Regions:
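Active-site-adjacent structural elements that line small-molecule/cofactor binding pockets in enzymes
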Residues: 1-289
């Protein structure tokens, strides 16, 4: 099943907070954008924020083959008993089109946050009982324990804010079969100062979160790299920026490290709810043309 999943999602997808909007006035805009992404050749859309099957359904209905996944659905805010029927409804209407991406979120964002690994295991037990099959769920796994869980109890991992070096480490733990689909921020800016400023603006909400900073420290970065918005070394490792050649080189580094698929998040300085459709087209011309 995992081989088929890799073929279904292809090499490239789009990661977007904007595409999960619940604003009824934007439904037409979102449907049109999803249809265009499918036409451009992207294999998947990954819905950022605390997303759910309800967010995925309109995009699936607006397209014919695009895979839509949550990235992520917080285990603290969605009960397995509810996720099961939601998955079953989508699967019945659109077989094979929805992937349930799960994560433990962060202590600063969840009041009841405690023993996240044990809570994730219990959540997976609940999904088993609710009929959500392991081969249709993915984990936003960063550390070794959660990566092993993604290998053993899911179809793979959808890590966020990682480097090619983390990707190689993740592949070693996962083995060959599971899907490894990291998110990668893409900054279409050739001026180094401007590109890094955009990256640091984006990183501002993540550097206070231990899940990410601990992962950076595990993979060779220092406390100095995490200060003042992130060092050039950290920024350049985490983001693809520059001209087409530079962006393609960073993307290739992830694939060489063992990624099967990349969830590309365009960062252009606009609000995260915006839909950077021109940038998506430009990326498609480089990667899929």
């Amino acid at each position: 099943m995992t081989t088929a999943l890799k073929e279904t999602v292809g090499r490239y997808g789009i990661w977007s907070v904007g595409l999960r909007s619940e604003d009824p006035d934007r439904r037409g805009e979102l449907a049109e954008a999803a249809a265009e992404l499918e036409e451009l050749g992207y294999g998947a859309v990954w819905l950022g924020g605390n997303s759910s099957a309800a967010n995925a359904a309109p995009l699936i209905e607006a397209t014919s083959k695009l895979t839509v996944g949550t990235s992520i659905q917080s285990i603290w805010q969605h009960e397995p008993d509810a996720a099961g029927p939601a998955f079953a409804d989508l699967e019945s209407a659109h077989p094979g089109r929805f992937l349930l991406g799960l994560g433990v979120s962060h202590a600063k964002r969840v009041e009841q946050y405690a023993r996240p690994y044990s809570a994730l295991v219990a959540h997976l037990d609940g999904l088993d009982a609710a009929g959500v099959p392991a081969d249709r769920r993915l984990l936003a796994a960063l550390g070794p324990k959660s990566l092993r869980l993604a290998r053993d109890r899911a179809a793979g991992s959808i890590p966020y804010l990682v480097t090619p070096e983390h990707t190689a480490h993740a592949r070693e733990i996962l083995g060959e079969a599971p899907l490894l689909a990291p998110e990668l921020g893409v900054i279409p800016e050739t001026d180094p100062s401007r590109a890094r400023a955009l990256a640091r603006e984006f990183l501002g909400i993540y550097l206070p979160l231990p899940n990410y900073t601990n992962n950076f420290l595990r993979h060779g970065f220092t406390e100095d790299d995490l200060s003042d918005g992130g060092s050039d070394r950290l920024v350049d490792a985490l983001f693809a920026w520059g001209d087409e050649t530079a962006i393609r080189a960073k993307i290739d580094a992830f694939f060489k490290a063992g990624a099967d698929h990349l969830a590309l998040q365009v960062l252009d300085g606009e609000h995260r709810d915006a839909l950077p459709r021109k940038a998506w087209r430009d990326l498609a011309a480089v990667l899929l043309g």
